From Swiss-Prot:
Swiss-Prot/TrEMBL domain comment: The RRM domain is necessary for mRNA stability and mRNA translation regulation.
Induction details: Up-regulated by the myogenic factor myoD during gastrulation.
Alphabetical UniProt keywords: Cytoplasm, Differentiation, mRNA processing, mRNA splicing, Nucleus, RNA-binding, Translation regulation
GO cellular component terms listed in the entry, alphabetical order: cytoplasm; cytosol; nucleus
InterPro entries referenced in this protein's UniProt entry, alphabetically: Nucleotide-bd_a/b_plait_sf, RBD_domain_sf, RNA-binding_reg, RRM_dom
PANTHER family referenced in this protein's UniProt entry, alphabetically: GEO13361P1-RELATED (PTHR48024), RNA-BINDING PROTEIN 24 (PTHR48024:SF10)
Keyword RNA-binding: yes
Residue ranges of domain RRM in the record: 11-88
UniProt-recorded name of the protein: RNA-binding protein 24-B
UniProt lineage: Eukaryota, Metazoa, Chordata, Craniata, Vertebrata
Gene (name only): rbm24-b
């Protein structure tokens, strides 16, 4: 003889979100108020024997199951659970008003601003938002306020001239051991000049200064 299995489509209830200390007996105790119960079981891990956090309750009739599912989020053993007919699957918990699936709420004052960023922090060209804070600095204004911007010959020549005048006040003096050497009066450190400032007259003056150091004269001085 073949035994006929009872149809539990409208009487078997899925119970999710159970605390780990919930047992078969405590689960049955909660659902007894809705009607007769044929089975109440908490699903456990086969290896550890601990609860997996969900179970099934089979009511004796459909009316009792409907009463048990009237509250989809009852408090069972101190924790909010979710209850639904097993064939329908688990029903998600009802979210609190003002929350939407973990998405952080944005203040209404920030909604009208691009990407939720205050307007004075948005670059005008990068975010197509015109007329905001960061102004465009003109090149002429930057050059007048910073000596590191414009390295043209006119801007750099004044510093080179001042440096040359300062070093010219300290001529090189020959020591007694080098009496025979010929030195140029008013010798100073060479100051780099812009390429545009070089003239044929300057090159000629430099050649004349070095011409005083004749190899024959220097060799004769060393032999003395």
């Amino acid at each position: 003889m073949h035994t006929t299995q009872k149809d539990t489509t409208y009487t078997k209830i899925f119970v999710g979100g159970l605390p780990y200390h919930t047992t078969d007996s405590s689960l049955r105790k909660y659902f007894e108020v809705f009607g007769d119960i044929e089975e109440a079981v908490v699903i456990t891990d086969r290896q550890t024997g601990k609860s997996r956090g969900y179970g099934f309750v089979t009511m004796a009739d459909r009316a009792a199951a409907e009463r048990a599912c009237k509250d989809p989020n009852p408090i069972i053993d101190g924790r909010k659970a979710n209850v639904n007919l097993a064939y329908l699957g688990a029903k998600p918990r009802i979210m609190q008003p003002g929350f939407a699936f973990g998405v952080q709420q944005i203040h209404p004052a920030l909604v009208q601003r691009p990407y939720g960023i205050p307007a004075h922090y948005v670059y005008p060209q990068a975010y197509v938002q015109q007329g905001l804070v960061i102004p465009h600095v003109q090149q002429t204004a930057a050059a007048s306020t910073s000596p590191y911007i414009d390295y043209t010959s006119a801007a750099y020549a004044q510093y080179a001239a001042a440096a040359a005048a300062a070093y010219d006040q300290y001529p090189y003096a020959a020591s007694p051991a080098t009496t025979g050497y010929v030195t140029a009066a008013g010798y100073g450190y060479a100051v780099p000049q812009p390429l545009t400032a070089a003239t044929p007259g300057t090159a000629a003056a430099a050649a004349a200064a070095f011409a005083q150091y004749q190899p024959q004269q220097l060799q004769a001085d060393r032999m003395q």
